[in-house]
């Protein structure tokens, strides 16, 4: 079924922004209003001003619901989103011989392609479906920019101008677990004799890998120091973390049935080589991101629920609080309220949590403290309900999903049309 609003919505929105004269540098290129200029200054330039030079890209992110005031500013990502939308929409065509990218105020020029011309290029299509472009995909450069962090030059140009998220929504930054051991003193929770310092299940983690919502591998760690989750081989402590960590590798993408999904997953792998470090103890589960690719997470210790939570590089963050989980479990037994969630979910390369179903994500890693998992299973048995925790959804055969929804706005067909439909 065609999306009648995708391409048309971008076209109408952009024309309205040009006519508003609210964005410096966003102007009509000719009197006929068939071409327009859009500012294209690199974030690493010394005179880069985020409020001015990224204003139109920010506006698109706001319009699409990808940014709201108070969120961390990511101008490079905003720019990539709009560029991808423009390049993949049949309504726009870059006029490279008019673009000026090597001047002090660089800009690109785009032409608005008339609908009749689109029909000639694509062939006759049903009315209202002209915004659909067969087999339109995000190019490799767009995918790469969306899944990795901005370059060092871009970052240095943004640090003084990018506001941080509100303090209330920032995860607590903790001392490095793999350099400095945490202090003792977590109060015990009454009523749980097993809840003590020496319970081995505190340090063990059950790690489950999901590609496109399908379980592809699982491991249970045993090392007290934690584990290194990466693509690399062990034996490189200086580059990938302390040598005493248990290596846990991502499963191969070879088993993914869809060729396109395999391609994009492997592309994402290229930015995850250094991986993340995981540590579990009686306080909870902690994570330290080392890889270039962006990693988002959810867990009961994450401050802001229901919005994307990105892990910053080289910061140790608590994502699961065992003490809080035990208190909520006590409440469950006392009042038959909702069973607390024992899971931490790491999402690689895509924003999370968001409105996109878990089954639609390229790479998800579910982490559970073995002790908390055992308590959940016992609670389920005692209530005669089996496991009360919903599993990550498996994709349904006839569902159609797309990679990077709202980014490649003109692509209205699913990439994966095999028996098992997966959005990535």
From Swiss-Prot:
Keyword field contains DNA-binding: yes
GO molecular function: DNA binding; DNA-binding transcription factor activity; DNA-binding transcription repressor activity, RNA polymerase II-specific; RNA polymerase II cis-regulatory region sequence-specific DNA binding; RNA polymerase II transcription regulatory region sequence-specific DNA binding
Phenotypic consequence of gene deletion: Mice display an absence of interferon (IFN)-producing cells and show impaired IFN production in response to viral infection. Complete absence of plasmacytoid dendritic cells (pDCs) and conventional CD8(+)-expressing dendritic cells (cDCs). Mice display reduced autoimmunity.
DNA-binding region range list: 7-114
PTM notes: Ubiquitinated. Ubiquitination by TRIM21 in macrophages, a process that is strongly increased upon interferon gamma stimulation, leds to the enhanced transcriptional activity of target cytokine genes. Ubiquitination leads to its degradation by the proteasome. Sumoylated with SUMO3. Desumoylated by SENP1.
Keyword annotations of the record: Activator, Autophagy, Cytoplasm, DNA-binding, Nucleus, Repressor, Transcription, Transcription regulation, Ubl conjugation
Matches recorded under InterPro entries: Interferon_reg_fac_CS, Interferon_reg_fact_DNA-bd_dom, Interferon_reg_factor-3, SMAD-like_dom_sf, SMAD_FHA_dom_sf, WH-like_DNA-bd_sf, WH_DNA-bd_sf
GO BP annotation list: autophagy; cellular response to lipopolysaccharide; cellular response to type II interferon; defense response to bacterium; defense response to protozoan; dendritic cell differentiation; follicular B cell differentiation; germinal center B cell differentiation
One Pfam family from the record: IRF
Lineage: superkingdom: Eukaryota
Record-linked SUPFAM superfamilies: SMAD/FHA domain, Winged helix' DNA-binding domain
Tissues where the protein occurs: Expressed in bone marrow macrophages (at protein level). Mainly expressed in lymphoid tissues. Predominantly expressed in CD8(+)-expressing dendritic cells.
Cross-referenced Gene3D superfamilies: 2.60.200.10, Winged helix-like DNA-binding domain superfamily/Winged helix DNA-binding domain
Induction: By interferon gamma.
UniProt subcellular location: Nucleus; Cytoplasm
GO cellular component: cytoplasm; nucleoplasm; nucleus
Subunit structure as annotated in this protein's UniProt entry: Interacts with COPS2. Interacts (via C-terminus) with TRIM21 (via C-terminus). Interacts with the BATF-JUNB heterodimer. Interacts with BATF (via bZIP domain); the interaction is direct. Interacts with SPI1.
Protein task: Transcription factor that specifically binds to the upstream regulatory region of type I interferon (IFN) and IFN-inducible MHC class I genes (the interferon consensus sequence (ICS)). Can both act as a transcriptional activator or repressor. Plays a negative regulatory role in cells of the immune system.
Family assignment from sequence similarity: Belongs to the IRF family.
Protein's recorded name: Interferon regulatory factor 8
Higher taxonomy: Eukaryota, Metazoa, Chordata, Craniata, Vertebrata
